[in-house]
């Protein structure tokens, strides 16, 4: 019996069930992945007990020599991964990283360009319900109605019209390559700075499967989970000239003490991403996503933008008479985890949506390749085409169990 099970059986039971859910379901939420045992071990370390306000060598507390070393390793590895001059590993999340850059470049009420949430952007890129949309003045840009890819002409037009101080580049549901150089040209034309939020594609950037924004954009932010396979957290990258202002905007600007156990886990994950097999992994992630998109298209489903260049497949389920919510809830019932997602020019409200977003990072971590992904894609199509047929569900559930059984999880369990 573990210490946790003995002291708090209720929490233990919930965590045990989550272990089982991850083990016996197909995780296809694009923003989720599975960390390695070493990453989890670092995350579970006694650094969770240590307060370390400030930065290495400049702390406000004593006893930080080991925390300093861990953070220095994380910084060094982050810079090496991306080829950046500066890295701040302290942001608790991608949202915190984005806000730090906003506060370093904008004053309250200043305007900035950001991708429309309904077209694949992110809450922190100017949504009215987010602080980025309340504190500053967002000017949304979107995708072309026919191609469903970024409308760079619209971006240029909006930039000239509004002359924002900052242009935010990046998305949370955009399956195509982003042309950072085009954004640079637009920004240079009006004297604006650029922040690239590569939270979803950072692993692809590290592995060379997507063009890098380093040296093109002024600021780069990312989460450290998703395709990087690290703990949940944030990261800021830039040139050394912005070090002082960015550091001050993170601490003491929007955060107090850093989460040192998370930074330790980041350091381990960054070390893993620097290994040759990480490139192999990311290449497989992209191959799997392309395979998945092809299956959907062959089966008569509409894939937004006609395919994918990264790890995301955005599927329009309305062509089958379904809503995104119905499809996501139904798939969850059979052990396939996705999320409902708006598609460009969606007629349904966000809480219902017309699409689902699928990703291949977690299944690829689990070991699935094109053959298995093709089977998963067909399984999803079979279920959606027989939606509501309870007699068919048992067949699909059995197929899911067969796949998960063949590719067991490799992560800590409570009894380890």
Curated annotation (Swiss-Prot):
- Subunit note: Homodimer.
Quote the protein name from its UniProt record.
Answer: Serine hydroxymethyltransferase
Which family would the database say this protein is a member of? Belongs to the SHMT family.
Q: Which PANTHER family match?
A: SERINE HYDROXYMETHYLTRANSFERASE, SERINE HYDROXYMETHYLTRANSFERASE 1
- The residues the record assigns to binding (6S)-5,6,7,8-tetrahydrofolate are 117, 121-123
List the EC numbers from the record: 2.1.2.1
State the HAMAP family in the record. SHMT (MF_00051)
List the residue(s) that the UniProt entry marks as the site Plays an important role in substrate specificity: 225
- Pfam families from the UniProt entry: SHMT (PF00464)
- This protein's record includes keyword Cytoplasm: yes
Q: Which GO terms describe its biological process?
A: glycine biosynthetic process from serine; tetrahydrofolate interconversion
- Any GO MF annotation of the entry: pyridoxal phosphate binding
What functional role does this protein have? Catalyzes the reversible interconversion of serine and glycine with tetrahydrofolate (THF) serving as the one-carbon carrier. This reaction serves as the major source of one-carbon groups required for the biosynthesis of purines, thymidylate, methionine, and other important biomolecules. Also exhibits THF-independent aldolase activity toward beta-hydroxyamino acids, producing glycine and aldehydes, via a retro-aldol mechanism.
Q: Which residues carry this modification: N6-(pyridoxal phosphate)lysine?
A: 226
Names of the cofactor(s):
pyridoxal 5'-phosphate
Q: Does the keyword Cytoplasm apply?
A: yes
Leader peptide range in chain numbering: none
A GO cellular component annotated for this chain's UniProt record is: cytosol
Q: Which EC class is the enzyme in?
A: transferase
């Amino acid at each position: 019996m573990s210490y946790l099970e003995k002291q708090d059986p209720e929490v233990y039971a919930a965590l045990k069930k989550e272990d089982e859910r991850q083990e016996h379901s197909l995780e296809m939420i694009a923003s989720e992945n599975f960390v390695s045992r070493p990453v989890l071990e670092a995350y579970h370390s006694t650094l969770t007990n240590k307060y370390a306000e400030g930065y290495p060598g400049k702390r406000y507390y004593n006893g930080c020599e080991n925390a300093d070393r861990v953070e220095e390793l994380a910084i060094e590895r982050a810079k090496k991964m991306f080829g950046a001059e500066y890295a701040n590993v302290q942001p608790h999340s991608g949202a915190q990283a984005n806000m730090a850059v906003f506060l370093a470049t904008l004053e309250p009420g200043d305007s900035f360009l950001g991708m429309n949430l309904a077209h694949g952007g992110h809450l922190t890129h100017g949504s009215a319900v987010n602080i980025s949309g309340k504190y500053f003045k967002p000017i949304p840009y979107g995708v072309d109605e026919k191609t469903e890819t970024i409308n760079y002409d619209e971006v240029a037009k909006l930039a000239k019209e509004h002359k924002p101080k900052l242009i935010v580049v990046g998305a949370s549901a955009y399956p195509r390559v982003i042309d950072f150089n085009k954004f640079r040209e637009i920004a240079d034309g009006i004297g604006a700075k650029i922040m690239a939020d590569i939270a979803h594609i950072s692993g692809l950037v590290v592995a060379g499967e997507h063009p890098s924004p380093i040296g093109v954009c002024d600021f780069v932010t990312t989460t450290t989970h998703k395709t990087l396979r690290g703990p949940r957290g944030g990261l800021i990258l830039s040139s050394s000239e912005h070090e002082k202002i960015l550091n001050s905007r993170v601490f003491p600007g929007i955060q107090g003490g850093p989460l040192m156990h998370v930074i330790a886990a980041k350091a381990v994950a960054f070390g893993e991403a620097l290994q040759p097999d990480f490139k192999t992994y990311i290449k497989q992630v992209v191959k799997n996503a392309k395979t998945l998109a092809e299956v959907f298209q062959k089966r008569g489903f509409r894939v937004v933008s006609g395919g994918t260049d990264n790890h995301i497949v955005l599927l329009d389920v309305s062509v089958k008479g379904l809503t995104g919510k119905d499809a996501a809830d139904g798939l969850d019932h059979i052990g396939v985890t996705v999320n409902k997602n708006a598609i460009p020019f969606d007629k349904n409200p966000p809480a219902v949506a017309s699409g689902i977003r699928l990703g291949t990072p977690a299944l690829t971590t689990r070991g699935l390749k094109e053959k298995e992904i093709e089977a998963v894609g067909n399984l999803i199509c079979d279920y959606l085409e027989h939606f509501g047929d309870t007699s068919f569900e048992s067949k699909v559930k059995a197929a899911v169990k067969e796949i998960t059984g063949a590719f067991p999880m490799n992560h800590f369990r409570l009894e380890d």
